[in-house]
Curated annotation (Swiss-Prot):
GO CC annotation, single: cytosol
Keywords assigned by UniProt, alphabetized: Aminoacyl-tRNA synthetase, ATP-binding, Cytoplasm, Ligase, Metal-binding, Nucleotide-binding, Protein biosynthesis, RNA-binding, tRNA-binding, Zinc
Name of the protein this chain belongs to: Alanine--tRNA ligase
HAMAP family (alphabetical): Ala_tRNA_synth_B
Binding site for Zn(2+): 556, 560, 658, 662
Species annotation: Sulfurovum sp. (strain NBC37-1)
Family note: Belongs to the class-II aminoacyl-tRNA synthetase family.
Alphabetical GO biological process terms: alanyl-tRNA aminoacylation; negative regulation of DNA-templated transcription
Domain writeup: Consists of three domains; the N-terminal catalytic domain, the editing domain and the C-terminal C-Ala domain. The editing domain removes incorrectly charged amino acids, while the C-Ala domain, along with tRNA(Ala), serves as a bridge to cooperatively bring together the editing and aminoacylation centers thus stimulating deacylation of misacylated tRNAs.
EC primary class: ligase
Location in or out of the cell: Cytoplasm
Gene giving rise to this polypeptide: alaS
Transmembrane segments: none
Length: 857
């Protein structure tokens, strides 16, 4: 039985629209990862987005919980039901049906023989202790002795401190008293006997800033059912990891380890940890998240290194995780086709991270074990920091290792060592000043919903000022300075998809006033332009886009061709990881395991210029996401696409989902030049390039530089001129070396009580090198050299196997020439201001030597 398909088909038959799983990286600045099925519908529930048609949806959403409020990482592998990545089946009602239908649907799906067909006597439900309505509905289906009431902790759900919220009802499956005997194996306990399989959230209130619950005029439904748990129940196993969703991983790990998986073995948890983490790491990599030192990339690294460490415990000493990717593709590639298309890129990134950690893990574990010998109850926080900072052990990996030994960590000492270092993982992902969560954008959204973007067709339009916000994003009737404007129709493109926001001007009709448009951004699906000038609500204006848009479009279209060119030259594993397109340059980040060679860069550049020279018309079509995928369009994870998408193609060269503006024909791009290729992070490369006017300016600048080089080398063939100069430099270096050698040969050596002594003034050469050569030549020697530099003097001393200490010698002699200095016993140097005193200094240096070597001191 395909439970995922059965669930989705059931709710589609009930009028729900099938919505695809949204990315694990949500379009929400307050979340690090998508952790529930309702995340992609959040704006609908809060009223910031309109209710769709139909007003009900169903989905199978991949979710990740590895930090913050919902953090299952510590339990993964050690319990039967916890995972970092899991699939949440859900049905949603947006001000449509409510408790009666939600409970009826759930009961039918759980118990009807056409669907899950679970025994009625095994089903228990919970409701909020104040929710008599839900209690009375459930009485129609199940005996009252199996309806339990609990308080806010267990049966009340809220999105945040304020906003939509409400009681919830959870459906539990009793796995049988004969299998579970813990005190926690009761309803409401933490045991595994009563397994929660479905949560029905009744969003019927809105909590205000005072904490008061106000009834919503149109309540909604949000439900979530864990696919992994239901599959285990239907397959008659009492551990999610023993279901068909995980056993193939455990079997493959057994092959790699050389020991089959055995649940009763002491190390069985390590098999389960690896199986779970393989899924989450693969999905994150496939969706464009890369290993990093902070943010989402650091969470990815934590999960990966936790899995590697468990492989180490099983005896694995070389990369192994990447060898499990094919098993994942076999199991989940049909539902999530991007896993198959990006499998090689996933393997490459995994293997690189494994190689990196395997280089340090053994030394780190050795340090950990050594410190453990000196530990009774509390592990040294400074050592934990060293494991983190030097050996790449994430903090929670060290805590995981300590938990196995029942030892706690001195976290205060660890935090002190961290000091000003940036926190590597945060409970909540913080965006860059998300103004939409603090300003009056919601008021504009409620009043106007959206505004019309006409910038694809024209760069100039007569329109009206619908609303204004001041610099603090507060609604106002007029501005005289900086602020934000919402136009009824706008030709200004709002920053998104890597393309910068448009600039330009507003001209007020019948007035000789121009208002500068500084930037354009999107807030709650509204294009707002930042302006500077005097403007009032209701003003009729002429909106004109800055001519720089033409160059921006060239760079954006060139980016599409560059993406296609990289895939053509380097391979299909190339996936976009970020981009920037403005009027002067483009920047493109992409997944690739190593630096590009000069030959590869040249080939990609030539590929793009070839497509430009073919004058390929740009074509734009609106189609469904499925149609776009069938057409071969490349989509980006993290980008928010609606039911219909805009597909931009340039013949067979490039086809991508894109909302940006582009040239009409590739020939308009002009010359394309790659200016730099560099690394961004592990497995991510960056290309910087220019085209159009910027490329022409670059060629002019290079031509001028070439002219200057010709002038400097006095040769119209600069390559030949430079070669000649290099030969001259080589000759001069040889002459200098000969002069230095001759100078060294002229040094006069005197033997004083068996010690070779040299005290002289030299005219040329590097006196430090000379002293090194002298020390290499003799078994014992004391040497001091002086060299005149204009009115000043340099002096240096060396000693090898003699009673003379070079530092003391220099300190005694340097003041004679108006200087000071010092150094080691074997070498010291100084500078002096009075070169006229060199002769005196030479004599005093010899006297100093004689006194020591002849026993006078």
């Amino acid at each position: 039985m395909d439970i995922r398909k059965t669930f989705l088909d059931y709710f589609q038959s009930k009028g729900h629209k099938l919505v695809p799983s949204s990315p694990l990286v949500p379009d929400d600045p307050t979340l690090m990862f998508t952790n529930a099925g309702m995340v992609q519908f959040k704006n609908i529930f809060t009223g910031e987005a309109p209710i769709p048609n139909p007003p009900r949806a169903t989905s199978s959403q991949t979710c990740l919980r590895a930090g913050g409020k919902h953090n299952d990482l510590d339990n993964v592998g050690y319990t039967a039901r916890h995972h970092t990545l899991f699939e949440m089946l859900g049905n949603f009602s947006f001000a449509d049906y409510f408790k009666e239908d939600a409970i009826a649907y759930a009961w039918e799906f759980v118990t009807d023989e056409k669907y899950l067909d679970l025994p009625v006597e095994k089903i228990w439900v919970t409701v909020h202790d104040s929710d008599d309505e839900a209690y009375d509905i459930w009485k129609k289906y199940i005996s009252e002795d199996r309806i339990m009431r609990f308080g806010d902790k267990d049966n009340f759900w809220q999105m945040g401190d304020t906003g939509p919220c409400g009681p919830c009802s959870e459906i539990f499956y009793d796995q049988g008293a004969e299998h579970f005997h813990s005190e926690e194996d009761v309803m409401g306990g933490e045991g595994d006997r009563f397994l929660e399989i479905w949560n029905l959230v009744f969003m019927q209130y809105e909590r205000d800033e005072k904490g008061t619950l106000n009834p919503l005029p149109k309540p909604s439904i949000d439900t979530g059912m864990g696919l992994e748990r239901v599959v285990a129940i239907k397959e008659g196993v009492f551990n999610n990891y023993h279901s068909s969703l995980f056993m193939p991983f455990l079997e493959k790990i057994g092959e790699l380890v050389g020991k089959p998986y055995d649940f009763d073995a002491p190390n069985s948890a390590s098999y389960r940890v690896i199986a779970d983490h393989l899924r989450s790491v693969s999905f994150l990599l496939a969706q464009g998240v890369n290993f990093d030192k902070e943010g989402r990339g650091y969470v990815l690294r934590r999960i990966m290194r936790r899995a590697i460490r468990h492989g180490y415990l099983l005896g694995l000493r070389e990369p192994f995780m990447y060898k499990l990717v094919d098993t994942l593709v076999d199991l989940m590639g049909k539902q999530y086709d991007y896993l198959a298309s990006r499998a090689e890129a996933i393997k490459t990134s995994m293997k690189m991270e494994e190689e990196r950690f395997f280089e340090t893990i053994e030394a780190g574990i050795k340090l950990f074990n050594e410190e453990l010998k000196n530990t009774q109850d509390v592990f040294n926080g400074e050592v934990a920091f060293k494991l983190y900072d030097t050996f790449g052990f994430p903090l929670d990996l060290t805590e995981d290792m300590l938990r196995e030994k029942n030892i706690r960590l001195d976290i205060d000492a660890f935090n002190k060592k961290m000091e000003a270092q940036k926190a590597q993982s945060k409970a909540n992902w913080k965006g860059t000043g998300d103004a939409a969560t603090t300003g009056d954008f919601k008021l504009l959204k409620e009043e106007f919903n959206t505004n019309e973007f006409v910038g694809y067709e024209t760069q100039e339009v007569t329109t009206k000022v619908l609303a204004l916000l001041d610099e603090n994003f507060k609604k106002t009737d007029a501005i005289n300075g900086k602020g934000w404007v919402l136009l009824e129709k706008t030709p200004f493109y709002a920053e998104s998809g890597g393309q910068v926001g448009d600039k330009g001007k507003l001209e007020i009709r019948n007035e000789k006033l121009e208002i500068r448009v500084l930037d354009t951004k999107k807030f709650l699906d509204m294009n707002l332009s930042e302006v500077e000038g005097k403007l009032s609500v209701g003003d009729e204006v002429k909106a004109v886009v800055d001519p720089s848009r033409v160059e921006i479009e060239k760079h954006h279209s060139a980016t599409h061709l560059l993406h296609a060119g990289l895939r053509a030259i380097l391979g299909d594993h190339i996936a976009q990881a970020g981009s920037l397109n403005d009027d002067k340059r483009l920047r493109f980040d992409f997944s690739h395991p190593k630096a590009m060679t000069a030959e590869e860069i040249e080939k990609v550049e030539a590929w793009v210029n070839d497509k430009i020279s073919r004058a390929i018309p740009r074509k734009t079509e609106i189609m469904s996401v499925d149609e776009a995928k069938k057409a071969g369009a490349m989509a980006l994870f993290g980008e928010k696409y609606g039911n219909e998408v805009r597909v931009v193609s340039m013949g067979d060269a490039s086809i991508e989902l894109c909302g940006g503006t582009h040239v009409d024909n590739t020939a308009q791009i002009g010359l394309f030049m790659i200016t730099k290729e560099s690394g961004v992070s592990a497995g991510v490369r960056r290309i910087e390039a220019i085209c159009g006017r910027a490329a022409v300016e670059k060629v002019k600048a290079l031509r001028e530089e070439l002219s200057q080089i010709k002038e400097e080398v006095k040769n119209q063939n600069p390559i030949a001129g430079i070669a000649k100069l290099k030969e001259q430099i080589k000759t001069l270096k040889s002459e200098v070396a000969s002069a230095m050698s001759a100078s060294q040969k002229e040094l006069s050596t005197v033997n004083v009580n068996g010690v070779n002594v040299i005290v002289e003034e030299v005219q040329t050469g590097d006196i430090k090198s000379m002293i090194d050569d002298v020390k290499n030549k003799y078994d014992n020697v004391a040497v001091m050299l002086f060299q005149k530099k204009g009115d000043k003097v340099l002096l240096a001393a060396g000693s090898k196997n003699t009673p003379i200490k070079a530092g003391d010698w220099i300190k005694a002699i340097a003041p004679i020439v108006g200087g000071g200095g010092g150094g080691r016993p074997d070498f010291a140097q100084a500078g002096g201001k009075d070169a006229s005193r060199i002769t005196t200094a030479l004599e005093e240096a010899k006297v100093y030597l004689s006194e020591i070597l002849e026993g006078g001191n």
